[in-house]
From Swiss-Prot:
GO molecular function (one): electron transfer activity
Subcellular location: Cell inner membrane
Full protein name: Ion-translocating oxidoreductase complex subunit B
Positions contributing to [4Fe-4S] cluster 2 binding: 114, 117, 120, 154
Free-text function comment from the UniProt entry: Part of a membrane-bound complex that couples electron transfer with translocation of ions across the membrane.
Key words of the record: 4Fe-4S, Cell inner membrane, Cell membrane, Electron transport, Iron, Iron-sulfur, Membrane, Metal-binding, Repeat, Translocase, Transport
SUPFAM superfamilies documented for this protein: 4Fe-4S ferredoxins
Residues that hold [4Fe-4S] cluster 1 according to the record: 49, 52, 57, 73
Root EC class: translocase
Organism: Shewanella amazonensis (strain ATCC BAA-1098 / SB2B)
A Pfam cross-reference name: FeS
Gene: rnfB
Chief localisation class: membrane
Cofactor: how and how many bound: Binds 3 [4Fe-4S] clusters.
Length: 189
């Protein structure tokens, strides 16, 4: 019994010593990041789609902080670009020519052809595809950003990118543009 207690105490002390060493190393060797890059990255949609020409949102945020154009993010659209322009103190630019005329699309899986390989699930950066191994998969259209990264890995080519149709749920209501009349209260004489 005493040998077990000695082993438990020694392991506890060993864990405490190594924890202190790791804590010291984390403080001593901390890598300072650029706060501007962190702010720009927080504004980007985090789809990691690569449509901007960079391998993810963090490298694009670093490029923007280094002076690159702010209009290369199709999933973020004009709203994201305007927020980045405000943060960087530059004029908003129209989205780049390659993305300006594009219609928003979402992935659609033809479920009767899906073999359940899970390659599209692994490729989706926003977890908009649900399913399990050897079972059909489907796309949560509200979460899909249209990044197109799930199409290429599909071995049976059962994923299509379909344009988003406007309906009552997807319509962009501009409530501030609706005129509201202010009626004066009846004045008593």
């Amino acid at each position: 019994m005493s040998a077990v207690m000695i082993a438990v105490v020694l392991l506890g002390l060993l864990a405490l010593v190594f924890g202190a060493i790791l804590g010291f190393a984390a403080v001593k060797f901390r890598v300072e990041g650029d706060p501007l890059v962190d702010q720009v990255e927080s504004l980007l949609p985090q789809t990691q789609c690569g449509q901007c020409g960079y391998p993810g949102c963090r490298p694009y945020a670093e490029a923007i902080a280094g002076g690159d154009q702010i209009n290369k993010c199709p999933p973020g659209g004009t709203a994201t670009m305007e927020k980045i322009a405000e943060l960087m103190g530059v004029e908003p630019q129209p989205l780049s020519a390659t993305t300006e005329q594009q219609v928003k699309k979402v992935a659609y899986i033809r479920e009767d052809e899906c073999i359940g390989c899970t390659k599209c699930i692994q490729a989706c950066p926003v977890d908009a595809i649900v399913g399990a191994g050897k079972l059909m998969h489907t796309v949560i259209t509200q979460d899909c950003t249209g990044c197109d990264l799930c199409v290429e890995p599909c071995p049976v080519d059962c994923i299509d990118m379909l344009p988003v149709t406007q309906d009552i749920k997807t319509w962009n209501w501009k409530l501030s543009a609706i005129p509201v009349m202010q009626l004066e209260e009846d004045k008593q004489c």
